[in-house]
């Protein structure tokens, strides 16, 4: 059985210019693999994040990252699948999640809906 933690709220960080936490979900699956999704809305778009979101979607097992989508500063949108880094074209939050879940399934994992 999967253990889930979930929060959907504005960030506890107050003040102008701070990113607002929109979503933080973490699921520990029965095989001890972890799916974690964190999404923030930025106060304004940036050159690296023109869509105005900062995100990290992670799937790993026993300390090994199998799939990760993120857009750290200086790198922009990209994904890691089994150790290989590739550019990622961000279209929407919904598409980001669908693409991540597709890669999780392709690596032999389960997405959250099927956990």
Residue ranges and their predicted role:
Residues 2-78:
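The feature represents the first ordered module of a protein
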């Amino acid at each position: 059985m999967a253990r889930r933690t979930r929060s959907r709220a504005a960030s506890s960080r107050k003040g102008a210019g701070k990113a607002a936490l929109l979503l933080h979900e973490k699921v520990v699956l029965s095989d001890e693999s972890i799916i974690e999704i964190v999404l923030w809305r930025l106060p304004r778009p940036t050159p690296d994040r023109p869509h105005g979101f900062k995100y990290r979607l992670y799937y790993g097992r026993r300390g090994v990252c199998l799939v990760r989508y993120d857009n750290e500063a200086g790198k922009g949108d990209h994904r890691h699948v089994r150790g290989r880094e590739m550019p990622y074209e961000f279209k929407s939050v919904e598409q980001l999640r669908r693409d991540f879940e597709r890669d999780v399934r392709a690596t032999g994992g389960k997405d959250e809906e099927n956990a």
